[in-house]
Amino acid sequence: NQIPIAVAAFANEELSPQLVSTIIRDDLNRSGYFRLIEVGTAIAETATVDFENWKGRGATALVVGSVQKKGEGRFDVRYKLFDVQKGEMLSGFSMDTPTPKIRLTAHKIADDIYEKLTGIPGVFSTRIAYVTKAGNQYRLEISDADGEGVQVALTSKEPIISPIWSPDGVKVAYVSMELKKPIVYIQNLMTGQRSTVANFKGNNSSPSWSPDGSKLLVTLSKGAIAQVYAINADGSDAQRLSNSNGIDTEARYSPDGRYIYFVSDRGGNPQIYRMNADGSDVKRITFKGSYNISPRVSPDGNTLVFISRRDGGDHVYAMDLANSNQELKLSDTNRDESPSFAPNGRYVLYATQTGRRGTLGIVSTDAKVKQKLTIQAGEIREPTWGPFMK
């Protein structure tokens, strides 16, 4: 049930290095919630709107705007959103935008349109992180949610694994093999500074943040079998939480911090379990299929996505935690890994394979909208979707 929307070219947008209206259209189109109506000419936000004309063309919403140059390297980007049926303005603002932030401003306008028309916050201005491999070089890269605007956070000859955003979107934790063993680091994306969180004997892996950003869950073997620990973000006070004779790993807090979901092969095959944040009261969560890994909880705590091996492939599944754990297969690809929720809970980013190449896919949590991200790189894996930025 898509919303028919007309996004006019912004007046004078050819003055800016990127066409604002094109970025907005691409965002809305990709979301799956909108059907774009052809417009033709540019329309400024100051123009008088002929609502009957737009009704006749089948639009229920109209976006207009302009771009004005403001001296060296700055633009004033203005926009208005109209409800065509009611003949009234729904939203609008102007943003003083430096040239490198034109894309971001366009994404923010698309976010505003999406939220005003669906009631759900938009995620076009959020960022993603992922690992690329070309030849024998690994790179931790950050980009816009559409795969554009790529920045390199780390380059290494050894594997980089399991990147994950801090709740404030300023840091990324990850595992690097650069010293020939897995070590967990935190890197500040603003300053480039990084610190070691876990470098114990044996395996240090699978970091994830507590909701308040003060702690991380990590998997440590400490020379024995891998178990789940909580550790302060400065690397102090590692406390063991899981206790089993199997491998326990891939631990994630629920958004309220009350529970931890994790993977264990204590019963013979990898399955997803839940325990209280202090490690007590362990319950098995997945019962279908003999291989279920990579649990991720939605921002509202109601949905669990994970990778399940069924029907000859590894697929992204969603489990409705609020409704008797009903399951829905989300992906139609079949070598999927590393699912990650968008911060609005409506989409899941994941890694998959196209041909023999690692690529990224996005699927809506109702499985209706599916898209591939086009990122110019060799192999792409280990995606993680960043939070809303303040």
Residue ranges with predicted function:
Residues 128, 169-172, 213-217, 257-260, ...:
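Hydrophobic beta-strand positions that form the internal "hydrophobic ladder"
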Residues 361-390:
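Blade-level signature of beta-propeller repeat domains, shared across WD40, Kelch, NHL, RCC1
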